[in-house]
């Protein structure tokens, strides 16, 4: 399951970041078409390092780091 902090691979072929791995910044629960905001290490042609994707366009490759109890 994709959640905040997960590492995901992009499956949208027309995307600049196709097959790249990024980190999920947030997931919108309001019902919009592209609810998953993903941040990347590199920037695209417009110097942007994030983009919105649908849940079908991302696949989780690594779960988020678990929170350590104090």
UniProtKB/Swiss-Prot annotation:
One of its GO terms (biological process) is photosynthesis. It comes from the Eukaryota. GO terms for cellular component: cyanelle thylakoid membrane; photosystem I reaction center. It is found in: Plastid, Cyanelle thylakoid membrane. Its main location: plastid. It is a peripheral membrane protein. InterPro entries: Elect_transpt_acc-like_dom_sf, PSI_PsaE. Belongs to the PsaE family. PANTHER family: PHOTOSYSTEM I REACTION CENTER SUBUNIT IV A, CHLOROPLASTIC-RELATED (PTHR34549), PHOTOSYSTEM I SUBUNIT IV (PTHR34549:SF2). Stabilizes the interaction between PsaC and the PSI core, assists the docking of the ferredoxin to PSI and interacts with ferredoxin-NADP oxidoreductase. This is Photosystem I reaction center subunit IV. It comes from Cyanophora paradoxa. The lineage of its organism: Eukaryota, Glaucocystophyceae, Cyanophoraceae, Cyanophora. The gene is psaE.
